[in-house]
Each structure stands twice: as structure tokens, then as C-alpha cells.
Amino acid sequence: MEGHSDMEIIRAVKGSATGEINVHLVARDSAGSHPHLPTTTFIIPTNAATLGLPSTALDVSYPREPVHVGAAERVAGSEPVTATILPQLSTGPGTNSTVRLLDWTGVSAPLAGSGMRFRINEYATQNMIEIERPRSPEQRHEGGTAGREADIQHPDVHKDPQEVIPQEPSVDAGSCKCQTCGPQQSIGLDVGSSGDRCPQPFQKRSVIVENSGCTVASELIKPMKKRKHKEYQSPSEESEPEAMKQGKGKDPDREPTPGTSENEEWSRSQLVSSEKKEGWSWESYLEEQKAVTAPVSLFQDSQAVTHNKNGFKLGMKLEGVDPQHPSMYFVLTVAEVCGYRLRLHFDGYSECHDFWVNANSPDIHPAGWFEKTGHKLQPPKGYKEEEFSWSQYLRSTKAQAAPKHLFVSQSHSPPPVGFQVGMKLEAVDRMNPSLVCVASVTDVVASRFLVHFDDWDDTYDYWCDASSPYIHPVGWCQKQGKPLTPPQDYPDPDSFCWEKYLEETGTSAVPTWAFKVRPPHSFLVNMKLEAVDRRNPALIRVASVEDVEDHRIKLHFDGWSHNYDFWIDADHPDIHPAGWCSKTGHPLEPPLRPRESSSASPGGCPPLSHRSPPHTKTSKYSFHHRKCPTPGCDGSGHVTGKFTAHHCLSGCPLAERNQSRLKAELSDSETTARKKNQSNLSPRKKPRHQGRIGRPPKYRKMPDEDFQALPPSVVHQSLFMSTLPTHADRPLSVCWEQHCKLLPGVAGISASAVSKWTIEEVFGFVQTLTGSEDQARLFKEEMIDGEAFLLLTQADIVKIMSVKLGPALKIYNAILMFKNNDDVFK
């Protein structure tokens, strides 16, 4: 049977001249039924002056904590319980052959083999400032024998610096400082009592003196290292620091082991990915590639500007040119600011029309600019052109107009001499460079003018200056022996004559002397620079000059396939010298490494550095495989341009199999150009839409009268709303394969099929989906067909169409699933 003994009182009494110190250990049975056991007294010779004990007795009471004594070590409580302190002897000079019991570190020192610690007070005497509480039986059992053996150390081993107790400020000789409560005044230092009564727990565990029935010199108890307090942790919490310790010093690019946590692998992969991007630099890359960058002198001032700060803020409103219709000015809102670039949103229209410009772009103007210059401004959807007012619009939308000083001043730019509105010239079709067509000057702003091709829609228009290599004086084609494309539907295209045409239209030609000759650029092949990815304009990548012409360069994105190469003007605002991104604060996409490109295959999982956040073990769905498998693609952008993100190969603008689709959208195909070149008198492409030239409305068949009854604050709801999340790294809010089963009539239907639905078909689908005829009737009243239905956002359904949130979520999720099915089927 196991017995217990309590460490009750140790009385240290200052001895006589011999300096004896009697240490009494009194053991008592826990039940109190046995008399006191025999005690063992150790007489340790030392000088009282060495210890500096006060004249009064020093009583030290230990907390009454039971000490386990094995039954095999004592029989019926007859054997004494012995605790021994082994002093460190010092025979150096000046020690007077005394025993140095305290190991001084600064002004405090612990007593070896005990939990007591002493310090020197302002009177140069030693006071005990701390005593540690013995461990409970449960704590001792937790440590076990292995823990005791690991904690025992020799007196000459230095302690861990973390375990050195800092000096307590201003504690006088008569005070005891509790670890938790603070100083306690007492005449006789009774630390054990104050510690017992302290309502707050001790922060450290004590070292217990183990008892032995038979002890020899080699088995004397040695000073023990204090064990740090360990908070209770759940198994998952305990495994995390262990995994972190195991991960130190290992290769960050190693493959995950079976015992490695998936969450840890994802966190590590994100860190590695960010380190790769942050660790990339132009200097090291140029040294590695043995290449040179394009000198800054080769760029225009607008391309190389880095000293100006981008002062535009989110939500600011301004006026700007529509890139798809360069002759039209729209109300725009700053939807995103990145470095020295802006993403602009057309107020009242879908985000699929958003576009990027530099902050110094000449195509943007402050609010009210159109009134001062006499231009025509297209108001947001729902506003009448003649009733639109900037002041009223800003109040209704609670928005701020972009300050005028943020725009590039164009007042110092003189107008082009000789170019006036209505004058005729010959111009190259930028979408079909092999064609030179009859054109007119339709607008002049500062030093630029707008070139418009006669009798064609404005989608072919472009802005240029007098030195543009794409414009020529009247009669240039005849002198060069090149065919001239007459205006569309010209009565007698075979016999087109400039003199007759100018007389019929009552116009004049731009003087020949007004045209300026632009010298060719000086870019060389293999020069490095930074360029906007035209397939995903939000990104700027490291590029190289692959080929050159007089006024154009062919760019290649380093590390990517040559299928992505494209031609661009040498003065285009989307190319910048090396280092432009870092100076303006814009992220730069580093070159795609061969390892990255080979580690991911079409249809497979992306490499570790491109992983999505892992799902937990309790999660029902995993979005790891919903990531775009194209190497180096972050999931942003879409091949159709209608969405801001994608997660399938069919929607990736960087996928090689989609390049034909992209080229068809970026410019007309070479086949079409050849056909037009062979028959230069054949009509060009018909206008993309009949009637009023401009951006197609959000609801194609919704009459304008329906919007007049809506307040402006309700109409302007499409800002910052997207059909898909902008960041594809974030998991989608639904799992298509599972949730499509919960929505009737959604599975197996693609967006291409929905776009052909009639108004009645949309009405029937909404009625079946929501089970409410009233909700479906709203779509019928608004004359929403399939194509308009796919353009709806959640905010449109809830706020504009006043559909309740529950049915609106079903409808919007159905739209997202249609689009996802379209990607899957393709």
C-alpha cells in the first residue's frame, strides 16, 4: 500500500560560532494515524556571514502537497524519509573554506536542489524572494520516470537563459512578493502560506525532491531543471507546433509526405509562391539570361512616367472615351486602383465592359469636361441625355468627382496644325492593316484627332496625332500603287475618284504638309521590358522583343509559348521600361519557369504553388480541382471577355486551344483580311448593331420608358458587381455538381442554350425554379430574354427587379451554373 508524507516545516536556524545550519525534514503520514517518523539532520559547515541570514529565525513552510513514497521503499512507515542537499565546495582563496550554496547570477541566485531563490537587497543582505510549489500527484504521474531523468542536470551545467528570473524592482527586506498577487508584508517570511492562500494559480511548477529508502553518495539528488508550464492543447493544436518544428531545415519545395497536414502544405506553398514572386528581381534575371533591358530613352514620356503619384480613389467618377467606340464619351467610375493604373467601369452597365488605363491617359477627363469642350456625353442607363446633370448625379449616387488636378493637363498641347473636323484623308484600318480606306477627321482634342472611316460604324475609329504612320494624305495609295477601299455602299466603287468625292461631300482634304514623319523606333530584338497582357489586362508581365518593324514591335512573354506573341505599337501606353512596376507600385508577373510549365498538364492539378486553399477533413466538397489548369494562370479573366474569372480550361484566355477565339476577338482573322485585300471593293463588316451607335444596354429589349420611373439611386446598382468572383483563388460559394441537383431545370443546360431563350421561356424557367408565378411575371414584364437573363447580377435581381432574397439567390445561382455548364461542355 502506498503511503504519503507531507513536507511540513523546514526550520533554518542560525547556529553558533561554528556556523551550523540544521535542516529538519518532518514526515507525517497523510492519514495522521502514525507518530512522527524519525528525521535525519544534515550539519553543513559554513559561515553565517556567507549566507547573510538575519538574526531572527527564518521559517519556511512548504505547501502541504503529498509526496508519493512507494510501498517497496518503506515498510509500515518505519524508515526515515531523507532529503539531501549536495553543496558545491569551493576551495579558492578568500572563501574561508566555506560552502557556496547559492549560484549567483546578478543579484539573485537559486538554492541548488530546492525551489528557493535569494536576492541581495539594498542593505547587502540576502532575502528569499521566491519559493516554488511542488507538483501535484497528477502532474508527477504525467512526467513519469523518463521526465525525472530528463530534468535532472549537474550543478555545473548553465541554466537556460529563458529560466533566469528577472530582477524585481524595489522590494524591501520585509516584504515577500507573491508570483501572482504582488508584494505581501510580513515579519516572518511565510511564502508557503501566502502561496497557498493566493486565489490565482502559480505560473510555474516546482521541482520536487524525490524520496528514496536507500541512498548512497552517487545517488544523491542533484539540482533539477525547472519545467516550463504547458497549457493544455487539443491533439490538433499540439500537432501544429510539432509539424512546424519538423519542417524547419527541410526543402520548401519537397513533395508533401503522408504525415504532413494539408493545411500546412497549403500555407507553406503560399509562402513559397510569394517568396518566389517577391524574390524575383530584374538584376538577377538579366544576369541569369545574359540580356539587356530596353533603354528608357526608347519610350515616350507617357510610357516611362514614374514620378507622378496616382491620386485616383475607388468610387471617383469621371468622363472617358469608350475603347470599343472611340467617338463616344461615357460616365465612368474608378472600380480598381493598382499602381499607376485604373480599372474603369461604365455606370449602369455590366462589368464585362470594364477596361484598364494609365492614370495619365489622355482618354479620361474630369466631370464636366464635355460641357466645356462641346462634346456629347452618354449618361448612365436610365438618364435622359438632355436632363443629365453632374451635380445632381453625384448627389443621388453619393459619389465624388475625380479632382481636376489628377488628370494630365492637355492645355499645353497645341492642336494639330492643318487637321480640322470634316477633312478627308487616307488611313490604315488598324483591325485590318492590309487595308487603306477613305477616312475623315471627326474630332480634335488637344494634339490628337479622331480618324473615322466613312460610312462605317465607330468601332473602327482610333485616335492619333499628325505623326502617326497609319494616316496618309489624299492620293497616297495612288502614288504608292496600293488599292484604296472606298466608303461603304459607294455607288460606283470601281471608279472612285477623290476629286469627285470631295466635290460630292463638300469637304476638303487634309493638306499634305500637315502630315509629320515619325522616325522609326530603336528597339532591338531580345530587349527586355514590361508589358500588359492583352488577354488579361489586369496583369503586367516580363516581355522580350521578338521582332521589330519600323513602328511596331512583336512581344513575347518570357517563359510562355510563342502562341501568345503579339504585335504592338512602339508608342503604345501598355508597354513600359523595366522597373516601371516596382516604381509605381504595380505587381509584376515574373517569367514562367520551365518547372512550373511542366508541372501542370491540361486537365490536371495545378502545381503546389498555385493550389487553392485546402478543404478541411470535415468539409464535404473540395475546390482544389476547380482551379484553372493552365500553367501560370491565376484564374482571372475569361476568353469571351464577359466574365471576370474562370476555372475551366475552356474559359482560360491563356489556354493555347483558345487562341483562335481570342485572335478573332482582338482583330479580324488573316483570312478575312486576305479576302478583303483580294476584293478591296467588297463591303466591309456590317455595323455590329443597327440604329443608335453605342454600348448595348444591359437589358436589350427593355424600353427606355421603363427606366424613367426608377430613381437614379436604384438604377445605378451594377457598380463593382461581377458575374463571377474577381479572384479565382477564392473558392466559389457553391459546388456546381452538388447544388445543381437542388435547383430544378438547371442540370445539363448551358449558357449558350439559355442565350437563345425567348421571354416566355425565361418566364417558364423562373416560375418552375421559384414556384412563384408572381416572381416570374416580373421577368416577363421587363421583357427579359435569355441573353439578358444571363447578364443579370444578384444585385440587379434583388434591387432593380425587387425579387426577394431567397428566390433571387436561386435565380442567380442558376445563372452561374448555366455559365459553368457552358465551360464544361466546351
From Swiss-Prot:
Q: Which Gene3D superfamilies match?
A: 2.30.30.140, 4.10.320.30, Transcription Factor, Ets-1
Q: What is this protein called?
A: Lethal(3)malignant brain tumor-like protein 1
| Basic residues bias: start-end ranges | 612-623, 683-700
Pfam families associated with the record: MBT, SAM_1, zf-C2HC
Q: Which GO terms describe its cellular component?
A: chromatin; chromatin lock complex; condensed chromosome; nucleoplasm; nucleus
Chain's gene name: L3mbtl1
Q: Which domain of life is it from?
A: Eukaryota
Residues found modified as Phosphoserine: 136
Q: Where are the zinc fingers (CCHHC-type)?
A: 619-662
Q: How does it assemble?
A: Homodimer. Interacts with RB1/RB (when monomethylated at 'Lys-860'). Interacts with p53/TP53 (when monomethylated at 'Lys-382'). Interacts with CBX3, ETV6, KMT5A and VCP/p97.
Locate the region Interaction with monomethylated and dimethylated peptides: 453-460
Q: Which GO terms describe its biological process?
A: chromatin organization; hemopoiesis; heterochromatin formation; negative regulation of DNA-templated transcription; regulation of megakaryocyte differentiation; regulation of mitotic nuclear division; regulation of transcription by RNA polymerase II
Q: Which UniProt keywords apply?
A: Chromatin regulator, Metal-binding, Nucleus, Phosphoprotein, Repeat, Repressor, Transcription, Transcription regulation, Ubl conjugation, Zinc, Zinc-finger
Q: What does the UniProt entry state concerning the protein's domains?
A: The MBT repeat 2 specifically recognizes and binds monomethylated and dimethylated proteins. In contrast, it does not bind trimethylated proteins. The MBT repeat 1 does not bind methylated peptides but inserts a proline ring in a Pro-Ser-Ser/Thr sequence context.
Q: In which compartments does the protein localize? A: Nucleus
Q: Ranges for the SAM domain?
A: 757-821
Q: Where is this region: Disordered?
A: 134-155, 220-272, 586-623, 663-705
Q: Which organism is it from?
A: Rattus norvegicus (Rat)
Residue stretches of biased makeup (Basic and acidic residues): 242-256
